[in-house]
């Protein structure tokens, strides 16, 4: 394969991995530990 193709595949893989990790952190098991500033601020 050409170098440009390998670089494009590598960058695409990094982007997909980062997006998957961000979604897992936001909506998966670790989201139970996130604090909600709107619930903490009771009027």
UniProtKB/Swiss-Prot annotation:
Q: Which family does it belong to?
A: Belongs to the PsbN family.
Q: Which domain of life is it from?
A: Eukaryota
Q: What is this protein called?
A: Protein PsbN
What is the first-listed, main subcellular location in coarse terms? plastid
A single Gene Ontology CC annotation of this entry is: chloroplast thylakoid membrane
Q: Which cell locations does it reside in?
A: Plastid, Chloroplast thylakoid membrane
Query: PANTHER family given for it?
Result: PROTEIN PSBN
Q: How does it sit in the membrane?
A: Single-pass membrane protein
Q: Which Pfam families match?
A: PsbN
Origin species, per record, is Suaeda aralocaspica (Seablite)
Please state the gene responsible for encoding this protein. psbN
- GO aspect biological process, one term: photosynthesis
Transmembrane regions listed in the UniProt entry: 7-27
Q: Which UniProt keywords apply?
A: Chloroplast, Membrane, Plastid, Thylakoid, Transmembrane, Transmembrane helix
**Stated role:** May play a role in photosystem I and II biogenesis.
